[in-house]
């Protein structure tokens, strides 16, 4: 993948996350801010999740209360380079834990 393809895929992912958060109808208040390719999710309990793109490595990084994860694009999904888990699955789990209710990204 070249830099242009990486940016397009990363932009699509960020847009998907923003659209999901904008439609979220749960009780938890989840705010997000995107600045310079970094998305920060803020939860009522003061915790945060940070998602950013690492252009030189063509990776998406995810930082949660539970730890940090690095994702590489494999076919149609972003896959963790340590656990093999899908980005959307890990993000949904982390958001659900930090929000105190089920949050699903699809």
Curated annotation (Swiss-Prot):
| ATP-binding as UniProt keyword | no
Give the record's keywords alphabetically.
Iron, Metal-binding
Q: Which Pfam families match?
A: Frataxin_Cyay (PF01491)
Could you cite one Gene Ontology molecular function of this protein? ferric iron binding
Can you tell which superkingdom this protein's organism belongs to?
A: Bacteria
Task: Write down the SMART domains for this protein, in alphabetical order.
Answer: Frataxin_Cyay (SM01219)
Per the record's keyword annotation, is Metal-binding included, yes or no? yes
SUPFAM superfamilies hit by this protein: Frataxin/Nqo15-like
The UniProt entry's GO biological process terms, in alphabetical order, are: iron-sulfur cluster assembly
| A Gene Ontology cellular-component term | cytosol
- Alphabetical list of NCBIfam families matching this protein: FeS_CyaY
Q: Which family does it belong to?
A: Belongs to the frataxin family.
* Known role: Involved in iron-sulfur (Fe-S) cluster assembly. May act as a regulator of Fe-S biogenesis.
Task: Name the chain's protein.
Answer: Iron-sulfur cluster assembly protein CyaY
This protein's species is Pectobacterium carotovorum subsp. carotovorum (strain PC1)
């Amino acid at each position: 993948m070249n830099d242009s393809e990486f940016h397009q895929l990363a932009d699509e992912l960020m847009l998907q996350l923003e659209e999901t958060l904008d439609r979220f109808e749960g009780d938890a208040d989840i705010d997000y801010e995107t600045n310079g390719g970094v998305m920060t999710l803020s939860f009522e309990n003061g915790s945060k999740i940070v998602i950013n793109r690492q252009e030189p490595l063509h990776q998406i990084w995810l930082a949660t209360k539970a730890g940090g994860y690095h994702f590489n694009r494999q076919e149609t999904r972003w896959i963790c380079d340590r656990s093999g888990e899908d980005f959307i699955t890990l993000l949904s789990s982390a958001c659900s834990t930090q929000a105190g209710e089920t949050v699903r990204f699809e």
